[in-house]
Amino acid sequence: MPSQVDAPQSKQPVIQCNSLYKIFGENAKRMLQNSKGVVDAKTFQDAGCVVGVNNASFEVHQGELLVIMGLSGSGKSTLLRCISRLTDPTSGKILIEGQDLLAMTNKQLIDLRRNKMGMVFQSFALLPHKTVLENIAFPLQVKGSSTQDSIKRAKDMVDLVGLDGRENYFPRELSGGQQQRVGIA
């Protein structure tokens, strides 16, 4: 269940997933249609398919936090990849602020990912030849910010993620948790 944080709740969910399925395999769509939404993982596995997400439905409103927990291989990352459209779901509906994510053009998806959502991967790719500050400023510069503005914003992010004093460190000089914070910043 999403948890309420101190913020006003809007009536429209920020994220809404309805009957979301992601099944990997050649016959996934056909099998899902034939199953009428009742997915038995063993039956799908016997047909050469792997069930990644099985009928996920939830809403997240402004100010809420959602924790997705499960065992290794249970589909947590697959669900998040579907929500960000890094992977297309086999079936279901995903709305972001009321907009149908599955109907968005590539241009709309790029805009959404740049301005409204992000994903921190388990294995993050920091540029090894750039410092903490440069790694944080780089995407801002790619997006069109001036060097001066991107450095200022990057310094603010360094403070926000608790890496003050490590701005000039290279990724190899940071712990795994510190590298993760650079990726988040």
Residue ranges, per PLM feature:
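Conserved ABC ATPase "signature" region
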Residues: 16, 33-42, 97-100, 141, ...
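ABC ATPase NBD coupling module
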Residues: 43-47, 101-118, 147-148
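Short coil-to-helix segment of the ABC ATPase nucleotide-binding domain corresponding to the Q-loop/switch region
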Residues: 130-137
